[in-house]
Amino acid sequence: MDASLNQWIRSPINDQPLPPRLTREQGQVIQLRQHIRKTLTAVWQKATHLAVREAGRELGFSINFEDVPGLGEVLGTLPPLEANFDHVRDINLNGTGVTDSIDGFLSNFERIRSLQADKNRLTRLPEALGSMRNLAFLVLTEGTVQLTESSIAALKELTLLERLGLSLNPLGLAPDISRMPALEVLELSQCEQRNWPTGLFDQPRPETFSLNLTANELTSIPDVEPGSDQARTLARTRLSRHRVSDAVLEKYNAYKTSVGIDPERINPPSGVQGRRQWTRGPGVKDKAEKQALWDRLEQAHGSEPF
C-alpha cells in the first residue's frame, strides 16, 4: 500500500504532470494527498488514537476527514488500496465535498457501521453502499442525490440501519424501509417527497421512532386504525402543515387526537427521552408518579412551549 500511495502523491493532477514548481492549487492537492496517506497509514497500522472504544472495549477504528475542504474530490482519485481495512468501523466525510467518484475509496471498507458525508456533491447513492451490510448509521444530507429504482433496491438491503439521514437532497422517489426493523431515525426533510416511505409499516416501529418529512408537499397519508400504534407513528411524524393538502392535514390531526397528542403541536412529544431527564438522578423519588405526571403534561393542549 505504501508504494501505491507514494506513487499517487507524485501522479499528475487533472491529467497534467507535476511541474518543477507547483502552482498554489497543485500544492494544495499534494497536501491533501499527503494528509490522506498519513491517515490511511495510521488506521491501517491500528494507531491507538484512531480507536473506537465503548466501556473500555475496543470496537474498531475511525477515519475522520471532517471539514477538510476539497478532500472529497481528491479522495475520488485514490488508487486501489492493497490492504485490509476490515477493522475500520466509522468514516466521517462531512464537509469534504465528496463526489460520485468516491466509490473506489469506499469499496475498501465493507464492514463499517457508520458513514457520514453531509454537504456533499453526490448526485446518486454510492454503489459501494450495496456491500456495506453492517451499516447502522448512514447520513448523506445536503447534496443533490436522486434515487432510482436500482439505488432504492440496494438501500433496502441495509437491514441493520438504525439511522438514515437523506435530508436536503432532491430524492424524488421514496426510500424503501420495509427490511429495516432496527430503524429509529429517518430524516427526509426537503427531499421532494410526495408519498410516505415505502414499507413504513412492514416492520413494527417503536414509540421513539422519529420520521422527519418537513418541507415536502405530501399528497397522501396512510389509512390506519385511529388510536393504533401505526396511528401513533404517523402522529409523531414531523411535517410542514402549509405544504400538505387539506385532506392530508385533516387526517394527520385526527391521528394525533386519537393517540392523545395535541393536534396543534409541531414537534412530537419527547416521550421516553423526556421522562428520563425528568426522573434521573440519585435523589429522585416516586419515579413512576413523576413519569405519569410528565406524560400528562406533554399530552395537555398547548403544553409544547413549556
What function would you assign to each model-found segment?
Residues 49, 72-81, 99-106, 125-129, ...:
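The feature encodes a structural signal of leucine-rich repeats
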Residues 20-120:
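LRR N-terminal entry segment and analogous cap-like coil->beta motifs
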Residues 83-86, 107-110, 120, 130-133, ...:
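Inter-repeat linker/turn residues at the boundaries of leucine-rich repeats
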Residues 61-63, 89-93, 112-117, 135-140, ...:
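Conserved hydrophobic beta-strand positions in leucine-rich repeat
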Residues 1-60, 258-306:
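Terminal targeting and flexible regions in eukaryotic proteins, enriched
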Residues 66-69, 95-96, 119-120, 143-145, ...:
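Conserved "Asn-ladder"/turn position within leucine-rich repeats
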Residues 141-157, 163, 171:
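Tandem repeat protein-protein interaction scaffolds
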Residues 154, 176-297:
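Leucine-rich repeat domain C-terminal region
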